[in-house]
């Protein structure tokens, strides 16, 4: 067992901890959710903080080199080896570098001993056997610089400048993991090896393996691969600071045309080492309650019809182990910063002066109790990822996860202490004084009067008297009686899948699939006829506001009232518009299933369309449109639709005035008939009793007035969508950095009605992705991530697209284009080799094999089990069809669809010429 000296608590008994003689630590947890899967993580306590001035970016560069050659795995073979075993690069095989640590990640699609052995072998290669071939370093340098170039956006630059302002002396402010162009360009094999040998030592390494394995088998495999790793002294861990505690009075203005107007005020205090004790957990709970109550007050203001700010955050947090920092952040519409920051400061001071009301405390304790109860009920089916996160909390010395059962017991012990007085005391003790704060303004244009004017407003807001808060009453939920329960007119079960399908007399369809995959969890999905097919060339934004339907509340409750009414209940309702349906989804518990169905039925039968639901969205439009085209990706997303559709308004961004003209009256006119009359299919997947679920649906949706029994065909031209006949190169411009460019090729294909063609195009996209990655990334070092995708519509007749592309340096635009064309021509001429096909196919087959191991996978089959039986059959046959595809089939598909001469080519280049 490891030393957990700073905690009063013991971890759950199911954990297995160990340490090899060389100092390497490991954590093992057996878990069968999802069954027969596992994950392997290796974390090295080495990040960008460990870099010397001339090594900035080296921790991240070394992470890249882990995939580029080691003693027993030649350069480029690690990813190929994993693909052959069913792990997709990026999805199942990945790594990340932060300021304090680097983590390598493998998600195993099967929990078999051979795959585990391979995974640990590869981790061991990364830990102690990297070769750092000079030519490999040179190639990967291009990839790392490409990643840096891609990430060099207005958002990252704003973050970096903000760190430098608030923590000017801190090492962390100068150690972004991506590094600098100068140090990366100068990096060589010797320098990277020196960093790796210094920082990658057993004593600073933790292995975490969670999954459907016997712990003894895992322990033996760890020893087999890592016991011979030679121990070396751990390097000193640099401090992330220093941070000047009494640094008030400074101010700064930072401008960028893509930024939202934002004011941040902050003060720093000394870092406090808080041991993991019962008393500290109690205080943490009180701080959480206080923070949520303050957030709730600010949320209420933001939901008003005329919100004083666009976004807001407040709180006190650690800056590594160097300081504590209290910050208030207010984002506003252009020129509205005085109102925004004044309002937020007023609410913050009201909280710290008077504390919460009893009603506010009651609302948050109800939410907390439910969260702890739900976690306890789901304890037996926690995911691999959940356990991995807990393992690293232990490994990093942050706290000891005590498990949902003990957590609930602890909460019950502390619940009586959650009083307004105790919450106020905890918040006051946590905050640092804002008497003379640091102030930073960021936005498009400087404030009138400069930073001095901002300080005058902040100073006034910090000194003005504030009134105490008022407590309000909580209403009863008004939607519990929908009339006479509906009668069942059809009740069947789909063989093999076990999905029960029912139809009520009013036309509502119900599909049920009970599972034991996640204890105490029920997924609910409503599929309603309509969607974007309701839009037209004359009304291209008809259903644009659908995601904001819930923001308008209900006829008898505002959204804010609902939040208080539903406190302590696991319910919710999101709405979205698909191509031909509307979808509302939620995850609840068996205890709250009745209320969940009542809430969804209420939104269907009595949406409120209250104007406050649009306030924040309407005020975000200016900033949204100001950011369009500020990065290559943004410029592409803006220009792609009109190019491919010949400016069909349905697939083209409309002017800002068109969005500003939208309101709930127009949404009601567009979707009101569908809410009232459209065909409706309800699906439940998870931990529930079938008969009880049927009874509850009968009382809610089954009791609604009769509605259409079939989803509409929409055969009056709504399904027509064209791909431009123009075959040329289009040039778009972006407002980002002068070295950033983006290249895309698009081809028209077909819809998904031909299953063989659709399956083949899916696999071909994966093959092309591998081929482009091998060429552009591994051989030429031109891009961080190549792209290949295929999309066959199930809505628009004969419509589909195939796309390839990459983000590249402007100077490499021509070379990248030649390489991409050559890659496609090679596949057309010779077809992919068998190894490439299997590397593409195996991860796809593993994903298909694991579909029935999660409720989400089952929902894909259950959601439209009655209205789309052919799609269900298609999904069931997908593995068989994928397995039958040959290299010759893929060659034929490439020849049929991917002629480079017939592509639409889009180049996105800087608006300003490169220097």
Where are these regions (language model features)?
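M16 family metallopeptidases and their MPP-like homologs
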Residues: 27-29, 34-51, 57-61, 76-125, ...
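Internal metal/ion-chelating core segments
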Residues: 183-223, 653, 659-704
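Penicillin-binding protein/beta-lactamase superfamily catalytic region
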Residues: 130-131
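Metal-associated gating/positioning segment near the N- to mid-region
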Residues: 65-73
């Amino acid at each position: 067992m490891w030393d957990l000296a700073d905690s009063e608590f013991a971890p759950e008994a199911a954990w297995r901890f160990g340490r090899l003689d060389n100092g390497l630590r490991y954590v093992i947890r057996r878990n069968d959710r999802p069954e027969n899967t596992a994950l392997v993580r290796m974390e090295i306590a080495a990040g960008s903080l460990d870099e010397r001035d001339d090594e900035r970016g080296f921790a991240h560069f070394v992470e890249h080199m882990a995939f580029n050659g080691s003693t027993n795995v030649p350069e480029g073979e690690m990813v190929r080896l994993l693909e052959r075993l069913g792990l997709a690069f990026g999805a199942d095989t990945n790594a990340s570098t932060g300021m304090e640590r680097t983590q390598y990640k493998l998600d195993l699609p099967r929990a078999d001993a051979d795959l585990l052995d391979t995974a640990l072998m590869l981790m061991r290669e990364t830990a102690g056997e990297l070769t750092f071939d000079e030519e490999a370093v040179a190639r990967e340098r291009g990839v790392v610089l490409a990643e840096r170039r891609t990430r060099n956006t207005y958002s990252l630059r704003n973050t970096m400048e903000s760190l430098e302002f608030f923590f000017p002396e801190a090492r962390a402010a100068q150690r972004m993991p991506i590094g600098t162009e100068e140090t990366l360009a100068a990096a060589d094999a010797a320098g990277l090896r020196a960093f790796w040998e210094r920082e990658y030592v057993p004593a600073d390494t933790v292995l975490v393996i969670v999954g459907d394995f016997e712990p003894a088998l895992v322990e033996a495999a760890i020893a087999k691969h890592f016991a011979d790793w030679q121990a070396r002294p751990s390097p000193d861990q640099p401090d992330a600071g220093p941070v000047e505690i009494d640094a008030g009075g400074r101010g700064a203005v930072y401008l960028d045309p893509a930024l939202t107007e934002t004011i941040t005020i902050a003060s720093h205090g000394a870092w406090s080492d808080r041991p993991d004790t019962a008393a500290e957990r109690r205080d943490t709970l009180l701080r959480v309650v206080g923070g949520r109550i303050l957030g709730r007050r600010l949320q209420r203001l933001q939901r008003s019809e005329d919100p004083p700010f666009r976004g807001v955050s407040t709180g006190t947090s650690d800056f590594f182990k160097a300081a504590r920092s209290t910050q208030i952040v207010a984002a506003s519409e252009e020129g509205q910063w005085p109102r925004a920051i004044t309002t937020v400061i007023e609410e913050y001071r009201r909280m710290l002066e008077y504390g919460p009301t009893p009603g506010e405390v009651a609302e948050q304790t109800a939410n907390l109790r439910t969260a702890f109860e739900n976690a306890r009920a789901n304890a037996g089916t926690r995911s691999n990822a959940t356990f991995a996160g807990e393992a690293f909390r232990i490994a990093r010395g942050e706290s000891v996860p005590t498990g949902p059962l003990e957590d609930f017991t602890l909460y019950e012990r502390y619940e009586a202490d959650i009083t307004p007085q105790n919450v106020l005391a905890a918040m006051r003790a946590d905050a640092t004084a804002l008497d003379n704060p640091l102030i930073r303004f960021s936005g498009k244009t400087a404030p009138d009067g400069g930073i001095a004017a901002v300080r005058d407003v902040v100073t006034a807001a910090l000194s003005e008297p504030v009134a105490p808060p008022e407590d309000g009453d909580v209403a009863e939920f008004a939607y519990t009686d929908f009339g006479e329960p509906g009668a069942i007119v059809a009740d069947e079960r789909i063989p093999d899948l076990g999905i029960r399908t029912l139809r009520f007399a009013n036309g509502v369809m119900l599909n049920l699939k009970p599972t034991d995959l996640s204890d105490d969890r029920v997924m609910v999905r409503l599929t309603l006829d309509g969607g974007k097919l309701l839009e037209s060339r004359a009304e291209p934004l008809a259903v644009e506001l659908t995601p904001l339907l819930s923001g308008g509340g209900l006829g008898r409750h505002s959204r804010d009232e609902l939040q208080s009414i539903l406190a302590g209940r696991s319910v919710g309702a999101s709405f979205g518009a698909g191509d031909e349906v509307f979808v509302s989804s939620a995850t609840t518990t068996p205890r709250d299933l009745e209320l969940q169905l009542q809430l969804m039925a209420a939104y269907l039968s009595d949406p409120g369309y209250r104007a406050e639901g649009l306030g924040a969205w309407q005020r975000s439009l200016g900033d949204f449109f100001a950011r369009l085209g500020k990065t290559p990706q943004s410029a592409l997303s803006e220009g792609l639709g009109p190019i491919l559709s010949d400016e069909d308004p349905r697939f083209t961004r409309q002017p800002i005035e068109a969005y500003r003209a939208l309101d709930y009256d127009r949404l009601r006119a567009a979707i009101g008939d569908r809410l009232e009359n459209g065909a409706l299919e309800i699906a439940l997947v998870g931990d529930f009793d079938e008969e009880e679920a049927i009874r509850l649906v009968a009382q809610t949706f089954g009791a609604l007035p009769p509605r259409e029994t079939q989803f509409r065909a929409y055969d009056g031209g709504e399904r027509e969508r064209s791909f431009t006949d123009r075959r040329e190169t289009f040039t778009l411009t972006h407002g980002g950095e002068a070295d950033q460019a983006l290249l895309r090729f698009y081809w028209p294909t077909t819809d998904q009605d031909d299953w063989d063609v659709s399956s083949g195009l899916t696999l071909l996209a994966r093959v092309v992705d591998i081929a482009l990655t091998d060429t552009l990334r591994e051989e030429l070092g031109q891009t961080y991530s190549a792209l290949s995708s295929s999309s066959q519509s199930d809505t628009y007749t004969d419509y589909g697209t195939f796309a390839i592309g990459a983000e590249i340096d402007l100077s490499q635009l021509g070379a990248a284009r030649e390489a991409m064309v050559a890659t496609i021509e090679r596949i057309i001429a010779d077809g992919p080799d068998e190894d490439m096909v299997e590397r593409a196919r195996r991860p796809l087959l593993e994903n298909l094999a694991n579909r029935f191991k999660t409720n989400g996978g089952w929902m894909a089959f259950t959601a439209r089990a009655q209205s789309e039986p052919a799609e269900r059959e298609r999904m069931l046959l997908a593995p068989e069809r994928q397995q039958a595809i040959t290299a010759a089939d893929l060659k034929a598909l490439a020849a049929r669809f991917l002629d480079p001469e017939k592509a639409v080519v889009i180049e996105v280049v800087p608006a300003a010429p490169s220097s």
